[in-house]
UniProtKB/Swiss-Prot annotation:
Major localization listed first in the record, in broad terms: cytoplasm
Record's subcellular location: Cytoplasm, Nucleoid
Organism, scientific name: Klebsiella pneumoniae subsp. pneumoniae (strain ATCC 700721 / MGH 78578)
Function of the protein: Plays a central role in chromosome condensation, segregation and cell cycle progression. Functions as a homodimer, which is essential for chromosome partition. Involved in negative DNA supercoiling in vivo, and by this means organize and compact chromosomes. May achieve or facilitate chromosome segregation by condensation DNA from both sides of a centrally located replisome during cell division.
Domain comment quoted from the record: The hinge domain, which separates the large intramolecular coiled coil regions, allows the homodimerization, forming a V-shaped homodimer.
Pfam families (UniProt xref): MukB, MukB_hinge, SbcC_Walker_B
Gene: mukB
Entry binding sites for ATP: 34-41
Chain spans, region Flexible hinge: 666-783
Domain of life: Bacteria
InterPro entries cross-referenced by the UniProt entry: MukB, MukB/SMC, MukB_hinge, MukB_hinge_sf, MukB_N_dom, P-loop_NTPase
Alphabetized HAMAP family for the sequence: MukB
Name of protein: Chromosome partition protein MukB
């Protein structure tokens, strides 16, 4: 039998009235007896303070303050202490006979609040010979001692071997040690437990039925159902974990989204700007180099242009000088051509005028003859017209006469008269007065002969006149010709001069005939001379272009050298062309390849980034796609292995969960059917009876009962036999044991205990050997121990499962990443680095461009040399055929000689041309000049007289002819008298008149016509004479002008002059064209020089500015790179794929990210300020600072409990994995958390039943307690009706309320609270939440109503209330309740403490005077029976018969107050024996 631990003594050091006092405590009752103020309450206060050193609970008041909530300012402790160090120490001997000293060090704290400082401590292993006062005080002399400090105590104890001193910083640790060592009955884990314990002590101290205890009897007496409570706590904890998981998911999602958003946008914002500055820096460097190259190139071009300008200016000056000479020569040639053309036109005019003059002379002679003939005819016509007119007049007169007579006679008379008139006119004209009509015929013949004679004479004179006129005109003509050729001369000299002119003309004609040959010869020589001069000019120009003077003999050799050079240069140029084409083709191929690579580079870089991420994630290095696919296969295999291991761990975890759930069943029933059968049979499960068995005894009892440890203990087997028939819903083996469940023991078996085994003699012939199980599950302690082990294993498995799930998720994500990589990037990831190839190509391109530039320069030089050589060969080709000309020095002299001869010939030709016709005309008539015809005038006069004579003869002959014609009329002489009677004559006269008038009309018409013709002939003659004279004058003028011109007007002169002019014009045009070209080239060269100068200045300015920018940017870039490298973000920011974007695209990308970042960091003041500062484009390093700030902010946000990295980018990956794991864990947990309402009702009902049985067992211990009229005390436990109805609904009608329990929005507690409110709508829940109500409903204690009843006299069982009992009865009843609570605590804590520990039991009772002797005896009996210690305080007149009594007397000596203590053991003995150590030690 295990002995119960006991408190040995209480020691007070430096308390008010007690300097160093040790009270030895009795094993049962210790009585403190003394008057008022003797120190009884101080002693008990010291004991309580040592037990519960909690200043928040300690409140020592006297009985006058009973029920008060506030007392003195120091709550009764500060005033009980003296200044300095104070101690209250308990000396305990526990069940293991270990001495344990526990206590507190107290010290007053100065101040108005009167506070006290308390330090608990414990001493183990102290020898029994050492008293507590010896440790706590130090003797100074026989009369003095001092209190040691806590440190000195510690040093003193550490010096003792085997003694352990422990100082506690918390009350919980202090009480934990006291519980483990059996000093207190209950583990006081929390302030609530300490408060309950203190309230218990306080109720014991002050006595009576404490309302605090009775109102909370359920909390004091009913233990928390560890199984039910644990199940519901696990469920609620799981729900809380579920919510935490949900919150973790939400936070993880939020963090992931935030991390993703911030990292992506910040990376885009900063990396775009970073790469833009990097690109701009590279571009600026390239531009600076390009500007420098352009600067040097422009300088060389400017120098070349300046040299070229000087050469062209010199050549232009030469051409300007030559142009004046050429213009003068051209003007002279043009003037000469004009003169030649004028002379030719003059010569043509002369020839034309000469021809016209010859023609006019012929026409004039002809016209003179025509005019003469016309004059003769005119005279005849005039005579005929006059005769006709006369006849008409005569006839008219006759007719008039005849008309007057109106007869023939009249007419004849008229005719006769007219005949007479004609006769008279003939007589007058012919001077023939004797003329008669009859002699008229004779005279007519005579006069006609005379007329004929006159006509012949006139014709003869006319012939003579013509001959004379011809001779006269020939002489005049010859004379005029001689005068025209020789000039004015005497008529007598004409003959000699004419002969001289004719002889000179023959010579001149001979010379003129040679002019054509001379002109041809001269033209040929002049052409050769011009060719010679042109060749000399070309030679001079060639020498000038060649820059060297060459002899004529060296030109052929030079021609061969130039041809050889041309051939060489042509081959070089051809090869250069091919080489240039090859270089350009290679350059184009490089550029095309570069463009292709630049397009492929971002794809390759993205593939490399993905590959690097895969390498970082996998920790592997991949050199080919085959390795990637092989690693993917390894990943698949690893994933399958991890999934298999995870599933195995998950299955083991689920098995453990099931085992934990099975072990957590109340009563230890692993099969829920057993609970139903036990309830049905009215029995109790054997495991429930042994539920409180200790952990050490569990293997024994498990082996003792063997398979029957799941048996049902029933009061009577006979009653169960009837129910066994037809029983199906039961285990295969059902054990039933007959016995009393309240007093069941293991006496039903005969057992022999072996080493770790038992032999159970079931019958005489049947034994069962059972070994102790290695994992016993019999009893609540064993099950809880197993559950703890399973929980630990489950935690390990959960951690392993989480790790495996994480690894699986990571592997799956890695597999997905590899799959994405294979699908998107495998084709290009392992190709050669395009950027490296681009760098090589750029280097090669630079070499090609330099080679091409050098080649272009060389080719340009070769081309210039080739063109120069070609021009030289072309010039030599023109010069070589003219070498003979260049060597001919006499050509100019011969040209001058031929020119002189030609001039003479041309002079002769001009003479012949001018006077050739005159000489030709003069030559046949030159002989007429020998004599001058002087009789021409006399001949002219004779001819005129002959003409007049002929005209007179003609008139006479006509008149006679008219008379002859009218001769018949003379016979009408007799008719004149008969005018009125002769109508025939009138008619004849009329007819004759008409004939005469018609004749007259014809004569007039003929005369008029001939007169007009004559006038016309005269006009023509005058016109011809005038024209002849004019042309003669003009011809003379033309000859004079031709002489004035002084130019030979031969046939080839114009052609030569035009050829010369054209040649000079061509030379002038060529010169002007060249000059214009030079001027334009010079202007262009000057403009080019100006442009180059401006370009040079601009390039110098741009180069300086760009260099300054490069230098400035370099400083900023160095700061940026220093920040980047110091913070290790270069890998994040240097995104090479961005290098292929334009500045506008990067700026747009940065601006978009900036807008998103402004929204993202709007709630973060620090990041918002850093972002605003980073927007300065002139300070790129601030963007890096912002990026670093973002990373730092994200690192601080990383939850290190779930993410094992400091890198936010890696944190995103782990967040993704953790998110998947948490989601899966949430799903699994939700499946596990589905708890059955029926099982909840069964658990609660079973727990209530067990606790009711336990309370009944506690009541058995109080049946014999009596105080005054109280004969017995008991606890009554009932189930509340509202809660009983809830249990019934949960177990039987739960399907009607599945809307609550299946709701995802309600926890089980909340659903239970809602159901309770639905079943009891009349109950006001107040301000409590459904969760709080539900948690209360899950506690079985809230289902029970407990009240204390007393059996008092004749009243029977009454509710224990202070008003219905006397003070002593109330004190006794309250003490009974407290004893029951303590016993209940011990039972509850038995499984938590070692089986060899039985805790101390001690209660207090102040003011025991209220109890009578019988009641005190009852207390003594109760203490003895329950092995409980009791400390009571009683007045001096109370002296118990048993136990130990201390008499306390407070005395004052020399102003020092002390308590005198005398200890007595009982009053039954005749002579009381003083206890040791009771001397006054004040």
């Amino acid at each position: 039998m295990i002995e119960r631990g006991k408190f040995r003594s209480l020691t007070l050091v430096n308390w008010n009235g007690f300097f160093a006092r040790t009270f030895d405590l009795d094993e049962l009752v210790t009585t403190l007896s003394g008057g008022n103020g003797a120190g009884k309450s101080t002693t008990m206060a010291a004991f309580v303070t040592a037990l519960i050193p909690d200043l928040t609970l300690l409140h020592f008041r006297n009985t006058t303050e009973a029920g008060a909530t506030s007392g003195s300012r120091d709550k009764g402790l500060h005033g009980k202490l003296r200044a300095g160090v104070c101690y209250s120490v308990l000396d305990v001997i526990n069940s293991r006979h270990q001495r344990v000293v526990v206590g507190v060090r107290l010290q007053q704290v100065a101040g108005r609040d009167r506070k006290v400082d308390i330090k608990p401590f414990a001493i183990q292993g102290l020898p029994t010979s050492i008293l507590p006062t010896q440790l706590l005080t130090e003797t100074l002399n026989d009369r003095q001692a001092r209190v040691v400090s806590l440190n000195e105590l510690k040093d003193k104890l550490e010096a003792m071997e085997g003694v352990q001193f422990k100082q506690f910083n918390s009350i919980t640790e202090y009480h934990s040690l006291m519980f483990d060592l059996g000093v207190v009955a209950r583990r006081l884990r929390s302030a609530s437990d300490r408060s309950k314990y203190y309230r218990l002590i306080e109720a014991s101290l002050y006595g009576g039925i404490s309302s605090t205890i009775t109102r909370s009897l359920r909390d004091y007496l009913l233990p928390e159902n560890s199984g039910v409570r644990k199940a519901f706590q696990d469920m609620e904890a799981a729900l809380r974990e579920n919510r935490m998981t949900l919150e973790a998911i939400r936070v993880t999602q939020s963090d992931r989204d935030l991390f993703k958003h911030l990292i992506s946008e910040a990376t885009n914002y900063v990396a775009a700007d970073y790469m833009r500055h990097a690109n701009e820096r590279r571009i600026h460097l390239d531009k600076a180099l390009e500007y420098r190259r352009d600067l040097f190139t422009s300088r060389s071009q400017l120098a070349a242009e300046q040299y070229k300008h000087v050469d062209m200016a010199r050549e232009l000056q030469e051409h300007n000088g030559a142009e004046g000479d050429l213009e003068a020569d051209y003007q002279a040639a043009s003037d000469h051509l004009n003169l030649v053309q004028t002379a030719l036109r003059q010569q043509e005019k002369i020839e034309r005028y000469e021809a016209d003059l010859d023609e006019l002379q012929i026409r004039l002679e002809e016209q003179n003859e025509v005019v003469a003939e016309a004059v003769d005819r005119q005279e005849e016509n005039e005579a005929r017209a006059e005769a006709a007119e006369l006849e008409v007049d005569e006839l008219k007169s006759q007719l008039a006469d005849y008309q007057q007579a109106l007869d023939v006679q009249q007419t004849r008379a008229i005719q006769y008269n007219q005949a007479l008139q004609a006769l008279e006119r003939a007589k007058a004209l012919c001077h023939l007065p004797d003329l008669t009509p009859e002699s008229a015929d004779e005279w007519l013949e005579t006069f006609q002969a005379k007329e004929q004679e006159a006509t012949e004479k006139m014709l003869s004179l006319e012939q003579k006149m013509s001959v004379a006129q011809t001779a006269h005109s020939q002489f005049e003509q010859a004379y005029q010709l001689v005068a025209a050729i020789n000039g004015p001369l005497a008529r007598n000299e004409a003959w000699d001069v004419a002969r001289e002119l004719l002889r000179d003309g023959v010579n001149q004609r001979h010379q003129a005939e040679q002019a054509q040959g001379l002109r041809s010869r001269l033209n040929e020589l002049e052409q050769r001379l011009r060719e010679q001069q042109d060749a000399e000019r070309q030679l001079a120009e060639f020498c000038k272009r060649q820059g060297k003077r060459y002899d004529i003999d060296d030109l052929e050799t030079l021609h061969q050298e130039l041809e050889a050079r041309i051939a060489s240069l042509a081959d070089s140029v051809s090869n250069a062309q091919e080489q240039r084409m090859a270089l350009r083709q290679e350059l184009e191929q490089l550029q095309s390849r570069t463009q292709t690579l630049m397009r492929r580079a971002p794809v390759w870089l993205a593939a490399q980034n993905s590959l690097n991420q895969l390498c970082e994630q996998s920790g592997e290095q991949f050199a080919s796609g085959q390795e990637v696919t092989e690693y993917l296969q390894q990943l698949l295999e690893r994933e399958r292995e991890a999934i298999v291991e995870r599933d195995e761990v998950g299955a083991r975890k689920r098995a453990i969960d099931e085992e934990i759930e099975r072990l957590s069943q109340p009563g230890g029933s692993e099969d829920p059917r057993l609970n139903a059968l036990a309830e049905r049979f009215g029995g109790v499960l054997l495991s429930e009876i042994y539920d409180d068995v200790s952990l050490d005894d569990a293997p024994y009892f498990s082996a003792l009962y063997g398979p029957s440890r799941h048996a049902i203990v029933v009061p009577d087997l006979s009653r169960v036999a009837e129910q066994l028939e037809g029983l199906e819903d039961c285990p295969e083996d059902l054990y039933l044991i007959e016995g009393d469940p309240q007093s069941f023991d293991d006496s039903v078996f005969s057992v022999d205990e072996l080493e770790k085994a038992v032999v159970v003699k079931i019958a005489d012939r049947q034994w069962r050997y059972s070994r102790f199980p290695s994992l016993p599950l019999f009893g609540r302690a064993a099950r809880e121990n197993r559950i703890e082990t399973l929980h630990a294993e489950r935690e390990s498995l959960s951690e392993r499962f989480a790790t495996l799930s994480f690894d699986v998720q990571k592997t799956q994500r890695l597999h997905q990443a590899f799959s994405r990589f294979i699908g998107s990037h495998l084709a290009v990831a392992f190709e050669d680095d395009p950027e490296e190839e681009i760098r090589k190509l750029n280097s090669r391109r630079g070499e090609l461009e330099r080679a091409l530039s050098a080649h272009e320069s060389d080719n340009q030089q070769n081309r210039v040399q080739y063109e120069q050589a070609k021009e030289g060969v072309s010039a030599l080709n023109r010069l070589l055929p003219r070498l003979n000309l260049l060597a001919d020095d006499t050509l100019a002299d011969r040209v001058d000689e031929i020119q002189e001869r030609l001039d003479e010939a041309q002079e002769a030709a001009r003479f012949i041309q001018q006077y050739g016709n005159q000489l030709a005309k003069l030559e046949p008539i030159v002989s007429v000049l020998q004599s001058d015809p002087e009789q021409f005038e006399q001949l002219k006069e004779d001819y005129a007289y002959a003409q007049q004579t002929q005209r007179d003869a003609r008139q006479q002959a006509f008149a006679l002819a008219e008379v002859v014609q009218r001769r018949a009329h003379f016979s009408y002489s007799d008719s004149a008298e008969m005018l009125s009677g002769n109508s025939d004559l009138n008619e004849k006269l009329r007819q004759r008149l008409e004939q005469a008038e018609s004749e007259r009309s014809r004569a007039r018409d003929a005369m008029r016509a001939h007169a007009a013709q004559l006038s016309q002939y005269n006009q023509v003659l005058a016109s011809l004479k005038s024209s002849y004279d004019t042309k003669k004058e003009l011809l003379n003028d033309l000859y004079k002008e031709l002489q004035d011109i002084g130019v030979r007007a031969d046939a080839g002169a114009e052609e030569r002059a035009r050829a010369r002019r054209d040649e000079l014009h061509m030379q002038l045009s060529n010169n002007r064209s060249r000059r214009n070209q030079l001027e334009k080239a010079l202007t262009f060269c000057e403009a080019e020089m100006d442009n180059l100068t401006r370009k040079l200045r601009k390039l110098e300015r741009d180069y300086c500015e760009m260099r300054e920018q490069v230098v400035t940017a370099k400083a900023g870039w160095c700061a940026v790179m220093r920040l980047v490298k110091d913070n290790g973000v270069e890998r994040r920011l240097h995104r090479r794929e961005l290098a292929y974007l334009s500045a506008d695209e990067l700026r747009s990308m940065s601006d978009k990210a900036l807008g998103a970042l402004r929204l993202a960091v709007a709630d973060n003041e620090h990041l918002r300020d850093v972002l605003r500062i980073s927007e300065d484009p002139k300070r790129p390093e601030r963007k890096i600072q912002f990026f670093v700030a973002v990373y730092q902010h994200l690192r601080e946000r990383i939850r290190q409990d779930i993410i094992r990295t400091d890198d936010p980018v890696e944190a995103i990956e782990q967040m993704e994995i953790e998110l998947s794991r948490l989601t899966e864990e949430l799903t699994n947990r939700e499946q596990k958390l589905a708890i059955s309402s029926r099982s909840v009702a069964n658990i609660i009902r079973k727990t209530i039943q067990r606790e009711q049985n336990r309370i009944r067992m506690l009541n058995q211990g109080l049946q014999s307690v009596s105080f005054g009229q109280v004969n017995s005390v008991r606890l009554n436990v009932n189930v509340r009706e509202t809660h009983s109805m809830l249990l019934d609904v949960l177990s039987e009608q739960h399907e009607q309320h599945q809307d609550l329990f299946n709701s995802n929005r309600l926890t089980f507690s909340e659903a239970l609270a809602k159901l309770y409110q639905r079943l009891n709508p009349q109950i006001d829940m107040g301000q409590r939440t459904p969760q709080t109500i539900g948690e209360e409903l899950l506690d079985y204690r809230n289902y029970l109503e407990m009240e204390v009843e007393v059996n008092r006299g004749s009243d029977g069982w009454l509710r224990a209330e202070s008003g219905a009992l006397s003070t002593g009865e109330a004190i006794g009843t309250g003490m009974s309740i407290l004893v029951m609570v303590v016993q209940s605590w011990e039972d509850e804590s038995r499984r938590l403490r070692g089986k060899d520990i039985s805790p101390c039991r001690l209660l207090f009772l102040d003011e025991a005077a209220r109890l009578d002797a019988r009641s005190i005896a009852t207390l003594f009996e109760l203490c003895e029976r329950l092995e409980m210690q009791l400390i009571i305080a009683a007045p001096e007149n109370i002296s118990p018969e048993k136990g130990t009594t201390y008499k306390l007397v407070r005395k004052v000596f020399n102003n020092h107050e002390h308590v005198h203590v005398v200890g007595l053991r009982g009053f039954a003995a005749p002579l009381p024996e003083a206890l040791p150590g009771t001397a006054d030690a004040s």
